[in-house]
Regions:
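Catalytic-domain carbohydrate-binding cleft regions of carbohydrate-active enzymes
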Residues: 1-182, 187-188
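Accessory, solvent-exposed terminal regions and/or long lumenal/extracellular loops of proteins
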Residues: 182-265
């Protein structure tokens, strides 16, 4: 895992193919492990990609007497911070995906072919992925990029996270403008994305009291959220919380919540 644009790019098919091979929890060393320090642009893009990996770790054994750390590029510290905070906000969604992986083997970072086997175009797409089931990610992986081409799989609509949830039909390639702050994401039609509030800064001692739900309604769809204390094995004796959200789209969008388990935190 060398600090290079090639490594950044090919980490995507490496991780998604390991997911297809029964290894759902994977991640690459952010910024590269061995070699010289990454450039500022490369490191920012690597963090923006790494926040979607099951294993997010910034560490290195550089051969130029540097140590890769989030604060090494002060000019981009806000971009790095914002990306990491976004990962924290995704904690409820990610933890539920981890639970699903433990039960079914479904990867956290999914190759598009995992969910869209009837779309022949996704068999040629190696550099996009699904984060969990419902978020398509097309990270910026080319140096100096000003635009990013994105293929949206056929069979459903997609909503652009960064463009006021602009709706696109699936089965087409679009080209979007990007800046250094861009983390291109598209929400799958029918999704319910649970996010923590902006105050969650660490998973040790911090607890979110509010969930923000992003809903892309389609017909009647069921989504499951899972939570427990994240530390003990008490979940084996029922100390967990599994919440089922049933969303029905019509003239109005209705949401029904049912839950099981005794975890209350």
């Amino acid at each position: 895992n060398y600090p290079s644009w090639k490594s950044l790019k090919y980490n995507i098919p490496l991780i998604t193919r390991m997911g297809l091979s029964g290894q759902p929890n994977e991640g690459a060393d952010i910024g590269g492990f061995a070699g010289p320090a990454p450039t500022e642009e490369l490191f920012v893009r690597w963090v923006q990609q790494g926040i979607f990996q099951a294993r997010f770790s910034i560490h290195s054994a550089s051969n130029d007497n540097t140590v890769t750390e989030p604060w090494m590029f002060r000019g981009s510290a806000d971009l790095i911070r914002d990306a990491i905070l976004l990962r924290y906000r995704f904690t409820p969604y990610l933890y539920s995906a981890e639970y699903n992986a433990s039960k079914t083997g479904a990867p956290i970072m999914r190759a598009l072919v995992y969910d869209f086997q009837d779309d022949p175009n996704v068999y040629e797409e190696s550099f996009e992925f699904l984060f969990g089931r419902d978020i398509l990610v097309a990270n910026v992986i080319e140096e100096g990029a000003k635009t990013r081409k994105v293929y949206l799989p056929a069979g459903c609509k997609w909503y652009d996270w960064s463009d006021k949830m602009r709706c696109y039909e699936g089965g087409q390639t679009i080209e979007i403008p990007v800046t250094m702050a861009s983390i291109p994401m598209f929400i799958r039609e029918g999704a319910v994305i649970a996010m923590a509030d902006n105050q969650l800064m660490t998973m040790e001692g911090d607890h979110t009291t509010d969930l923000h739900l992003i809903v892309a309604p389609k017909g009647t769809v069921t989504t499951t959220l899972y939570d427990d204390d994240g530390v003990t094995n008490d979940f084996k004796s029922g100390v967990f919380r599994k919440t089922t959200i049933t969303t029905t789209a019509g003239e109005r969008v209705t949401m029904d919540f049912t839950s099981e388990g005794s975890y209350e935190d």
